[in-house]
């Protein structure tokens, strides 16, 4: 690997690590626990998780829905724009919606 490529990778990883640390510092433990509890209760009642976002957050939402689904939590990606044009019909009482901005 060229030195400038190695330097670019190091710069990216440093920036990504800094952003991840800032994100983790901003998490409120009680809020996180409440969200997890909400998802658990929904699941027990037969509910599902819908994750939504538009643009880059939409890509993250799709990936998050996929991760949840592959680990046993019924989850779906709900496109933020299409949701207001009829796609909300897939939501039922007891479901949880996670919005990513």
Predicted regions and their residues:
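Conserved N-terminal alpha-helical segment that immediately precedes and caps sugar-phosphate-binding
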Residues: 1-101
């Amino acid at each position: 690997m060229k030195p400038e490529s190695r330097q670019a990778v190091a710069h990216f990883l440093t920036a990504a690590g800094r952003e991840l640390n800032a994100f983790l510092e901003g998490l409120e433990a009680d809020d996180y626990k409440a969200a997890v509890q909400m998802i658990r209760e929904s699941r027990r009642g037969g509910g599902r998780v819908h994750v939504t976002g538009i643009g880059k957050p939409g890509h993250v939402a799709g990936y998050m829905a996929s991760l949840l689904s592959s680990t046993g939590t019924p989850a779906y990606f709900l496109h933020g724009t299409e949701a207001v044009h009829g796609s909300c019909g897939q939501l039922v009482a007891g479901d949880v919606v996670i919005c990513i901005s």
